[in-house]
Amino acid sequence: MTEKYHDGDPMSDVISGDYRMLQILSRFGITLGFGDKSVSDTCKAAGVDVSTFLTVVNYVKDPSRAHINDMVEQVDLPALIRYLKNSHSFFVDFRLPNIRRRLIEALDCSASNQIAFLILKFYDEYAAEVAHHMEYENTHVHPFVESLLRGELPSETFAAVTDQHLSLIHISE
């Protein structure tokens, strides 16, 4: 059984056990060089909501132990939206192009190899769908939630946002 991380734990303990935590630090805008500082001190120094950070870290560490209702109450939505936008940027700007480069390196892309070109075409279409989906979230879903948090009634209804979001998911299936 894995234990949850807490605000008093050293941040170095969080990253030493799982390399994925480095990506989470980056997406929250936390840089390395925190030494022996606690999670709380590190997050506060970086202007990151401690509860939101711990919720994401503990969920990634062990999703089976996550209690979604407890998590919702602890999360600062603007902090989570920033994290999600940074995650989208990482995937669209770095991860997807890196996967494509590795595919090209692994495939025989000679003029006579149509299979390689079909694989690349399929990947490019998939990557475009993922990028489109993330762009939709960044331009519609996140602003919708942000306007609700400001107490404004958005011009789009929740049903319109979710219907469009679901249609994007079904396109990629």
Residue ranges and their predicted role:
Residues M1-S172:
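Small-residue-biased structural context
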